[in-house]
């Protein structure tokens, strides 16, 4: 299956609630590559590459988030697959 790449910005109560770790663990379980980081505006940004079905499952999980979070919305951009990531990581 051909991989896809998405860049997502998550807004709401998503910092200080374990959202990056949740994003990371979910991506690892789905065998995706990419990264996640907090933004200064209080949002979380992430990029993921992998098979369409796994990326869609990951996005569905991000819409819910971990129990302490309150996701207000996701902005999702499709990007060109670059294949530059070896794993999924948390960036600081």
UniProtKB/Swiss-Prot annotation:
Enzyme class of the recorded protein, top EC level: hydrolase
Keywords: Hydrolase
InterPro entries: Acylphosphatase, Acylphosphatase-like_dom, Acylphosphatase-like_dom_sf, Acylphosphatase_CS
Active site: 20, 38
Enzyme Commission numbers on file: 3.6.1.7
Gene3D superfamilies: 3.30.70.100
Record flagged with keyword Manganese: no
Keyword RNA-binding: no
Protein name per Swiss-Prot or TrEMBL: Acylphosphatase
Lineage: Bacteria, Pseudomonadati, Thermodesulfobacteriota, Desulfuromonadia, Desulfuromonadales
